[in-house]
Amino acid sequence: MMSSSSPTQLASLRDMGIYEPFQQIVGWGNVFKSDINDHSPNTATSSIIQVDPRIDDHNNNIKINYDSSHNQIEAEQPSSNDNQDDDGRIHDKMKRRLAQNREAARKSRLRKKAYVQQLEESRLKLSQLEQELEKVKQQGHLGPSGSINTGIASFEMEYSHWLQEQSRRVSELRTALQSHISDIELKMLVESCLNHYANLFQMKSDAAKADVFYLISGMWRTSTERFFQWIGGFRPSELLNVVMPYLQPLTDQQILEVRNLQQSSQQAEDALSQGIDKLQQSLAESIVIDAVIESTHYPTHMAAAIENLQALEGFVNQADHLRQQTLQQMAKILTTRQSARGLLALGEYLHRLRALSSLWAARPQEPT
């Protein structure tokens, strides 16, 4: 009896593509056994099976497919070098991200610092405005009839705007000098600053008509500014001493002209100061009333006193005229850039005087 793996079955297995070589060996063994038992040469001869060449081709195809699949799997698996490259790229990306975070944090700290400084400046300005408002409330700028002096109230509003504009112009000068703009552009800024001071002198002239004592007493200025005040403003000679260190180098001709300007300014200051002293003396004499003649000469003496007070307005205007002339003469003596540096120094000086007053007012008070 034949084994279960007959030639017909082998052929069907080959057609299905699941032929097993071990099954072929088993089949051959059964055939040889049948030949020995039957002792029939015809049977033995007919039992020899010719191997189909397609079997070898099929086996070769299986081996080739296996090798190619194995090679493909190996190719798909990343090598150690690729892993190292990926790790390096990830590490570089993390370093860049950390650097970006540090830079963002640094910029955030700078913005916070600038914001805190701005708040502090605003606090100082608010404190100064509160002090000025309180001073206005206490004095009221009242005239003899108790009405508000509109001329002085208008001057205080205009002067507040003038200070804001002054701060902006000083900042423009600083930026222009740092950026090295052309002399033509810089000259326009210098002339604009000089005109800005001229506007202040005109404002003061109008205020002097409303109340010269308010103006000459310095009630419109801070406490530190009043400490340096001379006839309603700064001394021209003081101005020259402040800006001189920022004008170097000067030519010999410039040095000579600046010295002459200092000398003439000092002489004009002395003349105005002497005039103020004589005015005070004359005013005091005009109101000294002898008890014997009080009833008959009182109106005459008071009229003379009023005339003397009216002359005080002229002294304030002359002092402002001297200040304006000193600024203009300095601009003529100096180059454009020297003038810009001088105006910048003057603006910073006046600004720091006002800031010093605010700091003094905001200082901690010792308990009494």
UniProtKB/Swiss-Prot annotation:
GO terms for molecular function: DNA-binding transcription factor activity; transcription cis-regulatory region binding. GO terms for biological process: defense response to bacterium; DNA-templated transcription. Residues 70-89 are annotated as: Disordered. Residues 70-82 have a biased composition (Polar residues). InterPro entries: bZIP, bZIP_sf, TGA_domain. Transcriptional activator that binds specifically to the DNA sequence 5'-TGACG-3'. Recognizes ocs elements like the as-1 motif of the cauliflower mosaic virus 35S promoter. Binding to the as-1-like cis elements mediate auxin- and salicylic acid-inducible transcription. May be involved in the induction of the systemic acquired resistance (SAR) via its interaction with NPR1. Belongs to the bZIP family. Binds DNA as a dimer. Interacts with NPR1 and NPR4. Interacts with GRXC7/ROXY1. This is Transcription factor TGA7. The lineage of its organism: Eukaryota, Viridiplantae, Streptophyta, Embryophyta, Tracheophyta. The gene is TGA7.
